[in-house]
């Protein structure tokens, strides 16, 4: 049983770290996406932020008894590449990193075959420029990480 939804978040982070897609993969301790974006300039040129989102639970019931629950953790990724002095950052690298993240997480079971599945749902580019910091190209990606529970 994988009802530890923080485990789902940590497993995504570990999977991306092992893939070597970015110089740094981290789950920053921030309360808002804006705070996460503001912290990007403190990280290496290529970084992936892993941020928790909503939890959703669905239940299958037969004969008045629960037989299965699907626990989904929404995860938002900020996939970023910097280019010193370039407004908008290094979009080519950010695009390539996003493709590699998509390949790595698509239907990935995070080592829990039949119990967990990653389902990337959407991705979009976002350019960010700070006045006194290098430009950053950022892609946001939403991934649904689902745990299939049959024991309680």
Listing of model-derived features with the role each one plays in the protein:
Residues 66-70, 78-106:
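Extracellular/virion structural assembly segments
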Residues 23, 45-49, 95-148:
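Acidic-leaning, charged glycine-interspersed low-complexity segments
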Residues 67-85, 135-149:
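Oligomerization/assembly interface segments of phage tail-like spikes and tubes
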Residues 41, 66-68, 130-134:
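Sterically constrained small-residue positions within well-ordered secondary structures
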Residues 1, 151-152:
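Compositionally biased, intrinsically disordered low-complexity segments enriched in polar/Pro/Gly
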